[in-house]
């Protein structure tokens, strides 16, 4: 499976070359493939804020490279550049304060920095750590893809319809994707008849990004309006909903792109299994449940303009980025450490004690 996935790889969204970070601008897709070069932490932070790069793992990887860029700039300026990097840590964290992968990646970089203060070449050591974070995510994607396929096969090995939400593919990670990585692997194993991709309003990550990724690999994909998901589950033979996660709490609650919660409710009603695929870096054991997750919102004004005209006075917009799916609606959480079925606090704690499977 690993070799087949590697051979099928067509999309990469993050590249590090000659001490420069290159990001595929997701805002321009699918109409234009445009790469933007970054040489500062401030630029990377803005890329995260403005959604040039999306997806929890991809944000964390980009932030790690952003810190390398900051270190390079600080070292040239001279003085105690180690201490000065604290400003860059804060700048990058503030770009997406709710993204646990970002804080995880930066904390790992901070720990590495503490160990290399007396290193002959601390900048090279920091760069190596960022590259390791990137490669580790890629390897985790491969492991999760295999585990997810095994889970699907255990219930049904025949070609079947799957439904997904937002974008969880190569654009959102350092490799093949989390949920979309599982779907890719299932396609290679002959277990996918068609993928239904929620358009995922208001940023349309499903129709702009997921459909583009799947179509580029010849995987049959149908884009549907978000509100049609329940109807599709009822009439199109969907067997699994496969989604990613921005944050998972100690009890197995999952924060993800807005609309995920209603998918889980509808899946349970229709007897459709619900799988969450995310690296263990998305798990925040410091939060007891989803009630503790700060859920970001974008400006409600974004919803109040149609064809360049604002809706009538007295109308307000509610524009949440995320919602929380309770653990009791989830059939399985797939990570690179293993699979947790019917997650709860005890099972999540046991999972986090395991070593990575790759």
UniProtKB/Swiss-Prot annotation:
Q: Which residues form the signal peptide?
A: none
Recorded metabolic or biological pathway in which this protein acts: Amino-acid biosynthesis; L-methionine biosynthesis via salvage pathway; L-methionine from S-methyl-5-thio-alpha-D-ribose 1-phosphate: step 1/6
Spell out the Pfam families in the cross-references. IF-2B
- List the active site: 246
**EC number(s) given by UniProt:** 5.3.1.23
Q: What class of enzyme is it?
A: isomerase
According to UniProt, the reaction catalysed is: 5-(methylsulfanyl)-alpha-D-ribose 1-phosphate = 5-(methylsulfanyl)-D-ribulose 1-phosphate
Q: Which UniProt keywords apply?
A: Amino-acid biosynthesis, Isomerase, Methionine biosynthesis
The record's section on NCBIfam families has: eIF-2B_rel, PRK05720.1, salvage_mtnA
Family annotation (PANTHER family): METHYLTHIORIBOSE-1-PHOSPHATE ISOMERASE
Function recorded in the entry: Catalyzes the interconversion of methylthioribose-1-phosphate (MTR-1-P) into methylthioribulose-1-phosphate (MTRu-1-P).
This chain belongs to the protein called Methylthioribose-1-phosphate isomerase
Q: Which organism is it from?
A: Pseudomonas fluorescens (strain ATCC BAA-477 / NRRL B-23932 / Pf-5)
Identify the gene encoding this protein: mtnA
């Amino acid at each position: 499976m690993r070799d087949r996935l590697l051979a099928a790889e067509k999309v990469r969204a993050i590249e590090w070359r000659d001490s420069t970070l290159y990001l595929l601008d997701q805002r321009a897709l699918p109409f234009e493939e445009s790469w933007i070069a970054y040489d500062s932490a401030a630029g990377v932070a803005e890329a995260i804020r403005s959604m040039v790069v999306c997806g929890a793992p991809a944000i964390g990887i980009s932030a790690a490279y952003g810190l390398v860029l900051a270190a390079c700039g600080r070292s040239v300026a001279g003085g105690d550049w180690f201490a000065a990097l604290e400003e860059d840590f804060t700048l990058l964290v503030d770009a997406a304060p709710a993204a646990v992968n970002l804080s995880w990646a930066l904390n790992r970089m901070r720990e590495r920095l503490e160990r290399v203060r007396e290193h002959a070449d601390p900048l090279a050591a920091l760069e190596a750590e960022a590259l390791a974070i990137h490669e580790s995510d890629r390897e985790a994607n491969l492991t999760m893809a295999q585990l997810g396929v095994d889970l699907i096969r255990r219930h049904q090995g025949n070609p079947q319809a799957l439904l997904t939400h937002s974008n969880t593919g190569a654009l959102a990670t350092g490799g093949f994707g989390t949920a979309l990585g599982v779907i890719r692997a299932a396609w290679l194993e002959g277990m996918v008849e068609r993928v239904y991709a929620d358009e995922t309003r208001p940023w349309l990550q499903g129709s702009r990004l997921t459909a583009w990724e799947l179509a580029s690999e010849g995987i049959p994909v149908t884009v549907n309006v978000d509100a049609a998901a329940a109807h599709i589950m009822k009439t199109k033979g969907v067997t699994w909903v496969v989604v990613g996660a921005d944050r998972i709490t100690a009890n197995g609650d999952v924060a993800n792109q807005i609309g995920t919660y209603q998918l889980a409710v509808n899946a349970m009603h229709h007897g459709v299994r619900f799988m969450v695929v995310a690296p263990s870096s998305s798990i925040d054991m410091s939060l007891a449940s989803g009630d503790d997750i700060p859920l970001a919102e974008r400006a409600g004004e974004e919803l109040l303009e149609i064809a360049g005209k604002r809706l009538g006075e007295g109308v307000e917009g509610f524009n949440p980025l995320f919602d929380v799916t309770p653990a009791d609606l989830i059939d399985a959480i797939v990570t690179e450490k293993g699979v947790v079925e019917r997650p709860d606090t005890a099972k999540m704690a046991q999972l986090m004690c395991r070593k990575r499977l790759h």
